[in-house]
């Protein structure tokens, strides 16, 4: 069975990490599903499932092609380890939280790609971002002003119970 790279995108505060955590728990018994940790040039937080990488290692990894995908956002570097591409090639469904900016390149990579957009109304996004209380989240207005600009295979409006939104995500992953 062919693998699939599932790219989860959406604005800050949409609840991507919450839904990914719930989906990972729901699919924990099935080795076909992989939820790798991103590399980010900041210390990990309780709200995200990331590993820290310093700026020099990030720049070196980008230059050497050691990442499946990499991008910069909010003044930080983000990357998916090269093992992500191998897992897709082995037939796994690999589910990653990424920037919309990398979707076009991922679709051109020759891998099977599915895009899931998780979103919420601006007032909910603002409330969730403010509740994090992280100085590195930067300018709240700038984060909320970003446009989608990506065609998704599934869009989840995450305004109600997280379990309901996660069930939609899990159903999509099982269909991949």
Curated annotation (Swiss-Prot):
Residues of the signal peptide: none
Domain of life of the source: Bacteria
Enzyme Commission code(s) on record: 2.7.4.23
One annotated GO biological process: 5-phosphoribose 1-diphosphate biosynthetic process
An MF annotation (GO) of this entry: ATP binding
Reactions listed under catalytic activity: alpha-D-ribose 1,5-bisphosphate + ATP = 5-phospho-alpha-D-ribose 1-diphosphate + ADP
Keyword Transferase carried by entry: yes
List of residues binding ATP: 10-17
Keywords associated with the record: ATP-binding, Nucleotide-binding, Transferase
Keyword Thylakoid attributed: no
Pathway: Metabolic intermediate biosynthesis; 5-phospho-alpha-D-ribose 1-diphosphate biosynthesis; 5-phospho-alpha-D-ribose 1-diphosphate from D-ribose 5-phosphate (route II): step 3/3
Family: Belongs to the ribose 1,5-bisphosphokinase family.
Function: Catalyzes the phosphorylation of ribose 1,5-bisphosphate to 5-phospho-D-ribosyl alpha-1-diphosphate (PRPP).
Protein name: Ribose 1,5-bisphosphate phosphokinase PhnN
Lineage of origin: Bacteria, Pseudomonadati, Pseudomonadota, Alphaproteobacteria, Hyphomicrobiales
């Amino acid at each position: 069975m062919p693998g699939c790279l599932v790219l989860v995108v959406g604005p800050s505060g949409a609840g991507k990490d919450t839904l990914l955590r719930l989906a990972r728990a729901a699919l924990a018994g099935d080795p076909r599903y992989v939820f790798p940790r991103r590399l980010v040039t900041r210390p990990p937080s309780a709200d995200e499932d990331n590993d820290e990488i310093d700026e020099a290692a990030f720049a070196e990894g980008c230059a050497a092609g050691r990442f499946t995908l990499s991008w910069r956002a909010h003044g930080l570097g983000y990357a998916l380890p090269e093992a992500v591409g191998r897992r897709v090639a082995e037939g796994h469904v690999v589910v990653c939280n990424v920037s919309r900016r990398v979707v076009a390149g991922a679709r051109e990579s020759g891998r099977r790609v599915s895009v899931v957009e998780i979103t919420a109304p601006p007032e909910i996004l603002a409330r969730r971002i403010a509740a994090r209380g992280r100085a590195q989240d930067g300018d709240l207005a700038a984060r909320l002003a970003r446009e989608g600009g990506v065609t998704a295979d599934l869009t989840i409006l995450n305004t109600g119970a997280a379990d309901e939104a996660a069930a939609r995500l899990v159903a999509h992953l099982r269909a991949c």
